[in-house]
Amino acid sequence: MAAIGVHLGCTSACVAVYKDGRAGVVANDAGDRVTPAVVAYSENEEIVGLAAKQSRIRNISNTVMKVKQILGRSSNDPQAQKYIVESKCLVIEKNGKLRYEIDTGEETKLVNPEDVARLIFSKMKETAHSVLGSDANDVVITVPFDFGEKQKNALGEAARAAGFNVLRLIHEPSAALLAYGIGQDSPTGKSNILVFKLGGTSLSLSIMEVNSGIYRVLSTNTDDNIGGAHFTETLAQYLASEFQRSFKYDVRGNARAMMKLMNSAEVAKHSLSTLGSANCFLDSLYEGQDFDCNVSRARFELLCSPLFNKCIEAIRGLLDQSGFTADDINKVVLCGGSSRIPKLQQLIKDIFPAVELLNSIPPDEVIPIGAAIEAGILIGKENLLVEDSLMIECSARDILVKGVDESGASRFTVLFPSGTPLPARRQHTLQAPGSISSVCLELYESDGKNSAKEETKFAQVVLQDLDKKENGLRDILAVLTMKRDGSLHVTCTDQETGKCEAISIEVAS
């Protein structure tokens, strides 16, 4: 038996496998260890990965990118609204669900985001099967710490639709620590770890406490306005200004030309992590003009200095939020492809001069490797080289119940505050007027602001056909159990009659 770990990011996906006591990333059929999370639709086929990304210049309206940003979200979600505006592939609402409108010329069809994610997961499964064989389908999927229940459900369903047997969803910072065996090297000590993840579209920071081999998230913060794409965009804008200076053409309003510049800027950005300069050459960029521009690392660092500053400010802000100083952090784990940037690493090192910066595992591989290790633990590998982590996941958001008081007014109660160590169990007594024959327990989640208009409903339990009472209230006992993977089981019982209803909100099978 073997196990698989998959990280589906906003801009790329990566798969690692556990085999023979070790976990490692598998290269795809193009020889790349990271696959663009891009799907392109044509008349006769669906293209996934690098080929889809390369074809976007001529097929941009039928090319889906960053699908993770819209998974499990509705049209009134602010992040979904931002995505809809920015997406080059048209997104519409149909029967209350968001859909991509794909027009291949032969037909127009609607595609749901989960199906796009399914195709990417299928590509990851195919890649894993190239080394494990087709019988290996057990997988652990990574999720951002701030994903809500609907987002986690959508991601899990997409993986299952691709043919995976989803063992568990694991939070990304927990997977990163597991990849480095943190907590296993010194199982009796206590330490605080900063997980710095600079992905394609966002910066995610987490401070984790490791105590006697147990992981716990202390604080976390995500900024969707800083990511690798923003560094690429900054460099592409510079290239556009250089082209204008040389040829008097402003191509910033030309989508095709800017897409070419973005592609060139992305390649240059990657090169500048290891080289002192990078050459950007584009054949016939605009009006038949070729473009050749050399960019030094120093120039790139100067252009991106505002982005670097935002990253450093975010670290300092999280330390303040946690009541920590830099001296309280024992290690820093780097994740996400853009954390490779040397200038950024130096700035982080300046904050934590005495702290070990962990980057020996490629930053865009560390999270799927941790997921594969977790999968290996779950399927019971006897020769796994890392002990069972005893990892404690935490609830990422507040979980609340909505009830009513004697007057019938709404009342919200927080049962699982964000950061609650999992597994956890809570009881809540809901009082409802005896004159009604049905009672509905509504479950909400929030990012911690705790005001009713900030809450998002994700489930409900309904007790029906209750005997009416002439006077007074009836007591409904709700028992909520949240497992380590974030799945929630809720039982509601009428204390007088014993009538009971239950639901499970699963995030992994």
Curated annotation (Swiss-Prot):
Gene Ontology CC: cytosol
InterPro entries in alphabetical order: ATPase_NBD, Heat_shock_70_CS, HSP70_peptide-bd_sf, Hsp_70_fam, HSPA14_NBD
Main location: cytoplasm
Keywords: ATP-binding, Chaperone, Cytoplasm, Nucleotide-binding
UniProt-annotated location(s): Cytoplasm, Cytosol
Record-level Gene Ontology MF annotations: ATP binding; ATP-dependent protein folding chaperone
Function statement: Component of the ribosome-associated complex (RAC), a complex involved in folding or maintaining nascent polypeptides in a folding-competent state. In the RAC complex, binds to the nascent polypeptide chain, while DNAJC2 stimulates its ATPase activity.
Protein family membership: Belongs to the heat shock protein 70 family.
Subunit (UniProt): Component of ribosome-associated complex (RAC), a heterodimer composed of Hsp70/DnaK-type chaperone HSPA14 and Hsp40/DnaJ-type chaperone DNAJC2.
Protein name as catalogued: Heat shock 70 kDa protein 14
Organism: Pongo abelii (Sumatran orangutan)
